């Protein structure tokens, strides 16, 4: 079961789902600028206190896309959505490059 969840998470990472929408600012650019970071729960979050509207929209769209994909995988595997999201979140944190932000289990933003 755990193997199946990890495989599903890996497939999600490879699916291109995390490339971000076609905003003026991509998800990767927002991460590189320290505006957005990965959360351990499998979603992205806003790092800065007063983000531009485009950043808020980007985060909302990416999280909606992720939630849909997590739900699809969870239904296929017969596991809770949270389990799929958590495993994917752990993988995303592992892949976060040095200098970018992530929120750990305590919810605080840290620079890797």
Regions found by a protein language model. Name each.
Residues 2-3, 22-112:
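Anionic, Ser/Thr-rich low-complexity intrinsically disordered regions
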Residues 1-9:
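Bacterial N-terminal signal peptides that target proteins for export
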Residues 8-19:
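Bacterial N-terminal signal peptides
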């Amino acid at each position: 079961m755990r193997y199946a969840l990890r495989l599903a998470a890996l497939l999600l990472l490879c699916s291109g789902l995390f490339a971000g929408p076609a905003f003026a600012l991509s998800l990767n650019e927002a991460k590189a600028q320290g505006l957005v970071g990965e959360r351990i729960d499998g979603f992205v979050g806003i790092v800065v206190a007063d983000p531009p509207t485009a950043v808020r929209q980007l985060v909302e769209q990416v999280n909606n896309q992720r939630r849909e994909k997590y739900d699809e995988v969870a239904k296929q595997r017969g596991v809770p959505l949270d389990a799929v999201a958590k495993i994917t979140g752990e993988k995303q944190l592992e892949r976060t490059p040095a200098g970018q932000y992530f929120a750990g289990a305590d919810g605080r933003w840290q620079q890797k």
